[in-house]
């Protein structure tokens, strides 16, 4: 019983985070293929990445209600925080044969931010603490990495943002490092430092900063 398990964790002073994977959802695409990302070459076929996993189209608003409902139900059983992962467009697969039937009138960042706002507003009455997982390179890239994620467009809608700065996910040559895996501390320090700088710039004005 999940509620009982969470109560046990709370009794031991453990802060419990519930992780919800969002747009990568092979189960839901089987039930509602009309909401899924499709193949450009045959728009009746659900697109899959190199691992055989399918995605819901970010712009599929009927799915947004499902995610909000899932968040409400999860929070009601006692989670201290709701963490949303795979809040992005797909990235690994045949990107030349991909079609987003629900997201054709807006850019990827715009579509994703619309979802963020809908999620935030839908869960606001619960008082739930919300967090978002982002690609690590959102800390340094100003573009959307072709997945819709832009750090500044995430900040207004979540209490915490967690860039996944795994050194293994950065390309060779990043920041001058031939192999980022050989510079674990330096990479994390550099990328998270950039994230802090951008967060301060996006959420505060110089006049509002005080130093003690």
Language-model-detected regions and their locations in the chain:
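Active-site-adjacent "subsite" loops/lids of carbohydrate-active enzymes
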Residues: 2-7, 23-76
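Conserved, mostly hydrophobic/aromatic
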Residues: 9, 16, 67, 74, ...
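Active-site-proximal loop/short-helix segments
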Residues: 26, 32-34, 81-109
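A structural motif
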Residues: 79-80, 158
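Glycoside hydrolase catalytic-domain groove-lining segments
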Residues: 102-134, 138-212
């Amino acid at each position: 019983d999940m509620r009982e398990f969470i109560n046990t964790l709370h009794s031991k002073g453990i802060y419990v985070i519930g992780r919800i994977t969002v747009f990568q959802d092979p189960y839901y695409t089987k039930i509602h293929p009309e909401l899924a990302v499709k193949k450009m070459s045959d728009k009746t076929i659900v697109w899959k990445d190199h691992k055989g996993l399918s995605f819901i189209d970010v712009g599929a608003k009927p799915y947004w209600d499902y995610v909000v409902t899932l968040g409400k139900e999860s929070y009601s059983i006692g989670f201290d925080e709701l963490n949303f992962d795979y809040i992005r467009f797909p990235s690994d697969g045949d990107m030349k044969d991909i079609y987003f039937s629900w997201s054709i009138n807006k850019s990827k960042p715009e579509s994703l931010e619309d979802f963020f706002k809908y999620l935030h507003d839908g869960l606001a009455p619960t008082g739930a603490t919300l967090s978002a997982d982002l690609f690590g390179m959102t800390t340094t890239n100003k573009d959307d990495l072709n997945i819709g994620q832009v750090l500044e467009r995430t900040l207004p809608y979540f209490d915490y943002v967690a860039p996944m700065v795994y050194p293994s996910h950065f390309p060779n040559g990043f920041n001058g490092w031939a192999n980022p895996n050989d510079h674990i501390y330096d990479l994390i320090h550099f990328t998270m430092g950039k994230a802090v700088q951008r967060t301060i710039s996006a959420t505060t004005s110089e006049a509002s900063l005080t130093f003690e």
